[in-house]
């Protein structure tokens, strides 16, 4: 099973490589496979590589043993099983350092088949003691695989309420996936809020998405094939419900159409969706005049 489905972000998320190529998404899918398209961007890797964790932080996150509660379940694991990691200071509170570390369940299973555990932690910047934790199981398969630089911490100003700022963690898959999918997504963002010693997820969304709208992208000579790709961004809105501010989710979309004996056409547009906190998590409550293109 893939990692949990996720949510939009500020600043702008990594742009899928398909957007930065002269090929349309449909034809790029033929050459590389859609999951490969969304997985291959180096922008994400460069961002994560600038925020490596120190040995003390990794050891502290690995040593945590907790059970139950909103933060998930975690047992102490060997540091040698680290698969991916990233750390950075938390601008909201200089006394806190953030860490996101993924561990393998064992030391022998090959990449692409591993059972993993993601841990997102707040650490005391001075002592490296873990003060709050979130744990999430992840299972690799043909559509989901982690690399060493697959994690990114998002410290944008997600001010949900006075004195409550959420932490974002983005998980980027490097799996190639199926060669001719109808839908693909990547860069899964989870927003977490601190509740005592636990970090609780309140919003999850994928930041890069692709889908087949019409036709068969894997038929190289076909015309009238329509595909759509999008990057999602998140911003705080003014209304407050159940104690937390609404969130505006914006999709910047590119629709590509193959045309016989002509250059493929591309059309750009933007769609907006409002997410509202229901006391447990953020859920969609309104859509643009046109239907939201990628479901909820």
Each language-model region and where it sits:
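Repeat-based blade/solenoid architectures
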Residues: 81, 138-153, 211-215, 292-294
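Bacterial N-terminal signal peptides
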Residues: 27-39
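Acidic, small-residue rich beta-repeat scaffolds with periodic aromatic anchors
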Residues: 42-76, 181-296
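Short N-terminal edge-element motif at the start of the domain
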Residues: 98-162
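Solvent-exposed N-terminal domain segments of exported/luminal and surface proteins
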Residues: 47-115
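Structural signature of eukaryotic scaffold interfaces centered on beta-propeller domains
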Residues: 83-94, 149-162, 233-242
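N-terminal secretory signal peptides that target proteins for export/translocation
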Residues: 1-25
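Acidic/hydrophobic-patterned starts of short beta strands in beta-sheet-rich repeat architectures
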Residues: 94-104, 160-173, 241-252
